Regions:
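Acidic, metal/ion-coordinating pockets
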Residues: 11-390
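Bacterial N-terminal signal peptides
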Residues: 1-7
Length: 390
């Protein structure tokens, strides 16, 4: 490694300024039976107050220690949380209880992407209310705002002396209520796509203006040492990214993105290391898959006969990032460790007691060694994810 640095960056040995760990999770889909699971696990005290965030803590308790020990934990918030209900919940129109946000906070999440196709499911009012509820729980929602300036604003987290910046963007919406730059807004990459658009059921697709996006990235990178971009993109249920995105991602990395976190397909796609022309190291995750949902319920709790059910496979993407300073004052980035932690959404496929929750493969196997065949089958289904940990 040092020899490579000297080749790229000169002859002086770089000085380590700091290192940190980010853990990233994929799509949170609070379907009806996810809510039912939480209600059945809710613990209420004598005053009628929930003691475990409406039961949502139970859903996340196995992965919480991983998130809590990270310096920064990220997830895609794929549902508004507005108690006032501006649209009925039906089909692909979502709304989650605010207790769900409490559970995300308790589990250890810090940064939530709210730039996705469900941002306006509860209209503009629901978007604004969700932002407030997130802030009330000492987390930050990125990619959506009370104005377009707020939606596009970089969120900066300080880790020791390192400035870590976050941006979030989506190239599709189910409902678009972006009406003016000074009203509620979701960060979009360009105008509405009019022809040769990527099909994804009923979503509205947006053209990616590469020049404008790269300009935004360059502006953001000048303010931080490490830049993390959340991008809601792709086609649902495809395990291979479109060529559109495999061509775009390296360009975005070259212009300043250090970690690119993709989501929307609801299944895993490749996670790859990337090295910029100046020697900086980075990571591209084309899709983090689902963090949890009610998808794929028909396969039972622990299927051993199929690699299907990929909407229930996911990862906690653990990335160690180190920032060095050179003799000339420049800062350089390495990825000393990339460890995707495999997870599985348990689902009893029962209307009365669905028991939906996120579980690490290692926990499933520890609790019952006879589930080894199941774990091996799931790892086979995600074999294209490089460097899977236990």
């Amino acid at each position: 490694m040092l020899a490579m640095w000297l080749c790229f960056w000169g002859h002086a040995e770089p000085t380590l300024l700091s290192s940190f760990q980010i853990v990233a999770a994929g799509d949170t889909l609070v379907h009806r039976r996810v809510k039912k699971t939480a209600r059945t696990k809710n613990i209420i005290n004598e005053n009628g107050v929930t003691q475990n965030n409406g039961g949502f803590d139970w859903i996340l308790e196995d992965v919480a220690p991983i998130l809590q020990q990270a310096d920064i934990a990220f997830v895609n918030l794929e549902s508004p949380t507005d108690p006032d209900f501006h649209r009925p919940i039906r089909g692909e129109v979502f709304n989650a209880p605010v207790d769900f946000l409490g559970a995300l906070s308790t589990a250890g999440f810090d940064v939530l992407s709210f730039a996705n196709n469900h941002s306006y499911d509860q209209k503009s009012e629901g978007l604004v209310r969700t932002l407030a509820e997130v802030e009330n729980r000492e987390m930050t929602a990125i990619g959506a705002g009370r104005s377009c300036a707020e939606a596009k604003k970089i969120h900066i987290v300080k880790v020791d002396a390192i400035r870590v910046g976050f941006l979030a963007i989506t190239d599709l919406l189910n409902i678009n209520e972006n009406t003016d730059v000074d009203t509620p807004c979701v960060y979009l990459p360009g105008p509405k796509c009019q022809k040769n658009c990527t099909p994804d059921r009923d979503a509205i697709w947006y053209h990616i203006d590469e020049n404008a996006l790269i300009s935004d990235i360059q502006t953001a990178k000048r303010q931080v040492d490490v830049l993390i971009l959340s991008f809601h993109w792709g086609i649902e249920y495809r395990t291979k990214p479109l060529s559109l995105y495999t061509a775009l991602a390296p360009k975005l990395m070259e212009h300043g993105v250090d970690v690119l976190l993709g989501h929307h397909p609801h299944v895993l796609q490749p996670v790859v290391r990337h090295t910029r022309s100046n020697g900086d190291e980075g990571v591209i995750a084309y899709s983090l898959g689902n963090f949890f949902s009610d998808m794929g319920k028909k396969y039972g709790m622990y299927p051993t006969s199929t690699t299907r059910g990929k909407t229930r496979d996911g990862i906690l993407l653990s990335i160690d990032i180190a920032v060095y300073q050179l003799e000339n004052g420049q800062r350089k980035i390495t990825i000393p460790k990339l460890a995707p932690i495999p997870i599985w959404t348990e689902n009893a496929n029962s209307n009365d007691n669905p028991q939906i929750r996120v579980r690490r493969h290692s926990t499933i196997l520890k609790e019952d060694p006879s589930r080894k065949a199941f774990v091996e089958k799931r790892r086979q289904a995600m074999s294209f994810i490089e460097g899977l940990s236990d």
